[in-house]
């Protein structure tokens, strides 16, 4: 059966290939998404190293002059997705969105290069671009020592509980009429609500009205929430960029120093109740819910004994690790996007950190559970952690990618 799934995973990656870049899945997500693309590269590296590097090169080719790599690149027209390039109005030569997404590309590039050192020249060419992107995060998003996101989509965890407090202060009442496309592809009960979408669009309209001034968006915009997940990913990305540069024989452009600077600011997101937590940087108020971003602390070398206890409780509370919200909380919603479900690609990131922290048994639990979910339900976007029901989009690129690169090949340092 595993051999059949290997072939199916490769077919999904090649089937979602649009010529130099992949889409997350046909229909629901018809463009190039930033962190999806980085995971796609990891998957391609198990059978086509050249194509893996091309994926990352295509992504970084659409970097903005200020260093930002946007969260969506609209390579071609497709009316099946909203909000499209006209709504964003960024004015880029190839249309893009006006925000970014968690910077996992350096981490993927490092693992890809470690598996095949012959591609060092291609890695070397990416280092300055990735370093410029990381510096952009420091300049345009780091406030009070940690990453503050200006839109829930920038976190990649669109409707997580983390953003509810900040979103309550966003006025979505004047966005005008619009037609969502996502709920025509998947069950609406698995997607963000209309009220959430109204506020998402209000934030896009604010950015557009202010010329996508990235610093102004952080300093004056309607929403700024410190995100543990993106902060931990950026710390790890800076560590991995330094290692990538060393392996490729080029300067790391300050990556190691950026990582240490960020580690020094982590106290901002440590909730006194004993866990890493999102925090509204406009009000100083913690979210108060143990959510998915916290599980990436080990990825950044920021594990604490309190988090070990939370991990054990969460693993014991569901059949399939790892729920994106503490399953003991009343707010846990097993099938609604980032309010409870298990995401295979996120499990891979969590497991990478756990393995590096010496938690081999916990990392293996995530690998085995994720494999069981895929064997039982296919290559879906995410799953119900209580019973394994597949949810969201099917034939999903990053789910196929982590099957090949993590579950089957054991690629990377978490093997």
Regions found by a protein language model. Give the residues of each.
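Hydrophobic/aromatic-rich effector regions of fungal transcription factors
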Residues: 87-100, 104-118, 349-353
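TPR repeat positional signature
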Residues: 37, 41, 102, 106-109, ...
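Core register positions within helices of long alpha-helical scaffolds
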Residues: 43, 108-111, 115, 237, ...
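Alpha-helical support elements that line or immediately flank enzyme active sites
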Residues: 37-66, 293-303, 347-360, 367
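Internal, well-ordered domain-core segments that constitute the primary functional module
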Residues: 101-167
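Extended glycan-interaction surfaces of carbohydrate-active proteins
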Residues: 1-32, 56-95, 146-225, 263-342, ...
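Extended, well-ordered alpha-helical scaffold segments
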Residues: 4-9, 48-61, 119-138, 237, ...
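Long, repeat-rich segments with strong aromatic
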Residues: 220-248, 252-255, 261-262, 336-361
